């Protein structure tokens, strides 16, 4: 009978369906399974591919109710349906009995992850770290040692579409952090387990937050507390002026009908100037700046008052000097202007042009000088050109009185009474041609 059982075990091909078996009957989930017994660094993985053939887990003599079995090298590989799609998060994933292992049987996480040995500092889990919260408000959860198997299986499985998504295996993405107090949080979403995954230098101090401590955001206007103003020293008056608003002025948050309007800001500016301790120099400059517009306005008002018709004299002084010539309406303010005007009526023209051939006479000397500059000092004109009257000529000499050459240049030493040699009597019209 014994030999017959051994022959049967030699020909036995074991097919394990963990979906039909409970978590206590699964060979990979029994308390007697130890990762140290496996000859490979990664024993049978829950996240392995379609079929899994472990070279050593079924060789253990106590893996199934203490019945010894011998492994055939030519037998069909052990097939199992250990797909994450068949394992629910609350059935096999969250209640794995790996946490019941002895302290000496547990190993550091980098020992199970040979591909991540360079990141030992990030994946090391201290053994003396507390596993649960000590606060009575937070529910108790299992220890963190069960994540050794989860992390080992998670990092060694390929990313395939048929397995459980990352949100179910990642403890930070499975459930929200804040839940109701009566609802029990799953093991993958506990704050204690997440703290074990954090590095030691970034781990936070565990704190318990009850729903009663969470206060809703105030919807009404918020006024600054009175204690914030009592903290400032009273002996320094400048601190009071630097506060953004006075205690009696409130600011509405979220409502357009707040008191912080442009009108209130304008009024607050005056309060700021009154409360601010100005230095004498600064105050004097401010006063001068405010006085300047008033001075300008007073000057403008004075000019407007002077231009008004009421301030003008009632009688305008008439021109005293009138021309006595019948039919002439000339009036002058000065006597000499009237005298010069009377010469035009008397036909007296004592001022005559000295240029030979030009005999024009003028009653006034200024008219004669204008005749010189406008008539004889320009080339190409109808009148004779005189070089002594041209300011641009090298022969310019306004005091010269004498004979001129046909081109208008002066003949020094000659007089106006002398006749010009070999020129005959020439008219002004001939010179112009």
UniProtKB/Swiss-Prot annotation:
This is C2H2 type master regulator of conidiophore development brlA. One of its GO terms (molecular function) is RNA polymerase II cis-regulatory region sequence-specific DNA binding. The keyword Repeat applies. Keywords: Activator, Conidiation, DNA-binding, Metal-binding, Nucleus, Repeat, Sporulation, Transcription, Transcription regulation, Zinc, Zinc-finger. GO terms for cellular component: chromatin; nucleus; transcription regulator complex. Residues 23-54, 238-268, 391-423 are annotated as: Disordered. PANTHER family: TRANSCRIPTIONAL REPRESSOR PROTEIN YY, YY2 TRANSCRIPTION FACTOR. Transmembrane segments: none annotated. It comes from Penicillium camemberti (strain FM 013). One of its GO terms (biological process) is conidium formation. A zinc finger (C2H2-type) spans 321-345, 351-376. Its main location: nucleus.
């Amino acid at each position: 009978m014994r030999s017959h059982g051994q022959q049967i075990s030699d020909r036995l091909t074991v097919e394990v369906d963990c979906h039909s078996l409970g978590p206590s009957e699964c060979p990979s989930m029994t308390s007697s399974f130890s990762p140290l017994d496996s000859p490979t660094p990664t024993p049978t993985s829950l996240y392995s591919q379609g079929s899994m053939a472990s070279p050593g887990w079924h060789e253990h003599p106590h893996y199934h109710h203490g019945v010894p079995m011998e492994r055939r090298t030519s037998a069909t590989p052990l097939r199992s349906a250990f797909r994450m799609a068949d394992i629910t998060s609350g059935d096999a994933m969250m209640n794995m009995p790996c946490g019941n292992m002895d302290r000496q049987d547990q190993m550091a996480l980098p020992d199970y992850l040979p591909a991540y040995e360079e990141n030992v500092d990030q994946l090391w889990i201290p053994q003396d770290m507390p596993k649960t919260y000590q606060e009575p408000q937070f529910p108790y959860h299992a220890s963190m040692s069960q994540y050794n198997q989860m992390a080992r299986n998670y990092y060694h499985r390929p990313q395939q579409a048929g397995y459980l998504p990352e949100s179910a295996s990642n403890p930070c993405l499975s459930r929200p952090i804040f839940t109701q107090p009566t609802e029990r949080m799953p093991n993958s979403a506990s704050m204690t387990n997440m703290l074990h995954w954090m590095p030691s230098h970034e781990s936070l101090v565990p704190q318990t937050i009850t729903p009663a401590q969470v206060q809703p955001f105030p919807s009404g206007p918020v006024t600054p507390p009175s204690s914030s103003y009592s903290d400032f020293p009273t002996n320094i008056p400048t601190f009071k002026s630097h506060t953004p608003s006075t205690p009696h002025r409130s600011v509405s948050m979220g409502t357009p009908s707040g008191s912080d309007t442009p009108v209130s800001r304008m009024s607050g500016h005056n309060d700021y100037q009154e409360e601010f301790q100005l230095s004498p120099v600064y105050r004097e400059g401010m006063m001068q700046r405010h006085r300047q517009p008033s001075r300008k306005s007073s000057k403008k008002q004075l000019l407007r008052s002077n231009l008004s018709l009421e301030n003008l004299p009632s009688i305008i002084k008439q021109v005293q000097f009138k021309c006595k010539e019948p039919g002439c309406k000339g009036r002058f303010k000065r006597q000499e202007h009237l005298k010069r005007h009377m010469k035009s009526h008397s036909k007296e023209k004592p001022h005559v042009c000295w240029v030979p051939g030009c005999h024009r006479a003028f009653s006034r000397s200024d008219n004669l000088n204008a005749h010189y500059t406008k008539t004889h000092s320009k080339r190409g004109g109808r009148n004779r050109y005189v070089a002594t009257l041209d300011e641009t000529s090298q022969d310019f000499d306004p005091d010269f009185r004498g004979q001129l050459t046909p081109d208008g240049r002066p003949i020094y030493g000659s007089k106006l009474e002398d006749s010009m040699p070999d020129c005959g009597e020439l008219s002004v019209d001939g010179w112009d041609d």
